[in-house]
């Protein structure tokens, strides 16, 4: 077997990101919870394989599949800009197990005010860790911005949950089960724009098809943030809509009436099953490298791009996660 060639582009995902299927395969790999079980030595080995390959040194005996596996293990644990190891619960591979536990508990303990407040706070604390761990190198999050987004999202989620809880007191019990979803949706609408407020102020980098940076656009930032909010809300729908319907039916059966302690683990399991599919599929709704027509950009940036290259009609940007 010959040595692996050096022309494999491991800077980009393995699968075609212009198709939904290609993006889905990419995110199924990125969010794979099994990556959390890898030891520090395994993570370092993957980092060495990737960094050596990028430097033009091929690890002896490695296959293309092993190279791609090392790339995804490396990406799952290390920050792409700083190279620092991301805290365990801040990694994309922790999304399913962490959200499974938190969402399952939000859906189980939705009746009493103290537990509603507690689990909404836990959820927003986890979101803050994820957002900080995956912050952009171009537009870093300051501690003040993180704190503002955290407090605002937590307040918004708790206020929505308690307000709707009060309004649904006299409605069928099934309606009350959907209050946590409304709170999470409201929090996403607050948290993500605040967390990325610097992008809304100065814009995000836009580039041509070859990756040549052309400037910064607030319009592109707004479009990217909107797409992320939609993805996050869609991600929560299956996990926060399907289990309540199933649990509402099961709790009327004698089996669960005699074993009420089974309610929480059963709900967490149902949420986990939904999230295993919803997380990667909803991350794949929009291309990571999104596009926008030059005609929709700010007049100054539009003029600047036309001056550099009048033939450019579409520019690209990283929408974030």
UniProtKB/Swiss-Prot annotation:
GO terms for cellular component: mitochondrial inner membrane; mitochondrion. The chain crosses the membrane at residues 146-164, 174-194, 226-246, 266-286. GO terms for molecular function: L-serine transmembrane transporter activity; monoatomic ion transmembrane transporter activity. Its main location: mitochondrion. NCBIfam families: mtc. Belongs to the sideroflexin family. This is Sideroflexin-3. It comes from Pongo abelii (Sumatran orangutan).
């Amino acid at each position: 077997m010959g040595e692996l060639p050096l022309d494999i582009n491991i800077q980009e995902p393995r699968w075609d990101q212009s198709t939904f299927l290609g993006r889905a395969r990419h995110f199924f790999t990125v969010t794979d919870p099994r990556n959390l079980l890898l030891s520090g030595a395994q993570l370092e080995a993957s980092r060495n394989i990737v960094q050596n390959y990028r430097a033009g040194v091929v690890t002896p005996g490695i296959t293309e599949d092993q190279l791609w596996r090392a790339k995804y293990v490396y990406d799952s644990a290390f920050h792409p800009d700083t190279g620092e190891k991301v805290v365990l619960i801040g990694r994309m591979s922790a999304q399913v197990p962490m959200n499974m536990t938190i969402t399952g508990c939000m859906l189980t303990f939705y009746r009493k005010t103290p537990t509603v407040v507690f689990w909404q706070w836990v959820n927003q604390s986890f979101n803050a860790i994820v957002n900080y761990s995956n912050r952009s190198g171009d537009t870093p999050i300051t501690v003040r911005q993180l704190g503002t987004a955290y407090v605002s999202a937590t307040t918004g989620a708790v206020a929505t949950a308690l307000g709707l809880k009060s309004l649904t007191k006299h409605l069928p019990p099934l309606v009350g089960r959907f209050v946590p979803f409304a709170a999470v949706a409201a929090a996403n609408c607050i948290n993500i724009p605040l967390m990325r407020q610097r992008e809304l102020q100065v814009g995000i980098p836009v580039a041509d098809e070859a990756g040549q940076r052309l400037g910064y656009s607030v319009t592109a930032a707004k479009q990217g943030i909107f797409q992320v909010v939609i993805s996050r809300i869609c991600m929560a729908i299956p996990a926060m809509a399907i289990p309540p319907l199933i649990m509402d039916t099961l709790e009327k059966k004698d089996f669960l009436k005699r074993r009420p302690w089974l309610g929480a683990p059963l709900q967490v399991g149902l949420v986990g099953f939904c999230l295993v599919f919803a997380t990667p599929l909803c991350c794949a709704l929009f291309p990571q490298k999104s596009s926008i027509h030059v005609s929709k950009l700010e007049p100054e940036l539009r003029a600047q791009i036309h001056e550099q290259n009048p033939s450019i009609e579409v520019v690209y940007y990283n929408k974030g996660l």
